[in-house]
């Protein structure tokens, strides 16, 4: 059985709710959900260019967990872009992770 999720500290503000290809209604496309902690990992690791150790400390998680989140987020973003799918971003209420 998996361990319960540890409380994560999130600070990134999500600018919109989704990204999708132009000209195709989103109801006709496959949706991929990017979780709030994955979004935060992308922000800290790829935008702010923090080391995994520093970013993990800011989120209150282990470096290994941060690495898993970052890899998962990158895969979801790459899949959405290359396969023409909808990437759903976390809502503001998703930031209240426990």
Swiss-Prot record:
Cited Gene3D superfamilies: Winged helix-like DNA-binding domain superfamily/Winged helix DNA-binding domain (1.10.10.10)
Pfam families to which the protein is assigned, alphabetical: DUF134 (PF02001)
Family in the record: Belongs to the UPF0251 family.
Protein name, per record: UPF0251 protein Sputw3181_3483
Organism field: Shewanella sp. (strain W3-18-1)
């Amino acid at each position: 059985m998996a361990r319960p999720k540890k409380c994560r500290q999130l600070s990134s503000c999500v600018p919109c709710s989704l990204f999708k290809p132009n000209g195709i209604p989103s109801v006709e496309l496959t949706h991929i959900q990017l979780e709030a902690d994955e979004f935060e990992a992308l922000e800290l690791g790829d935008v702010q260019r923090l080391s995994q150790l520093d970013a993990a400390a800011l989120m209150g998680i282990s470096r290994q967990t941060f690495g898993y989140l970052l890899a998962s987020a990158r895969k979801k973003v790459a899949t959405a872009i290359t396969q023409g799918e909808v990437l759903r971003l976390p809502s503001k209420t998703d930031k209240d992770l426990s």
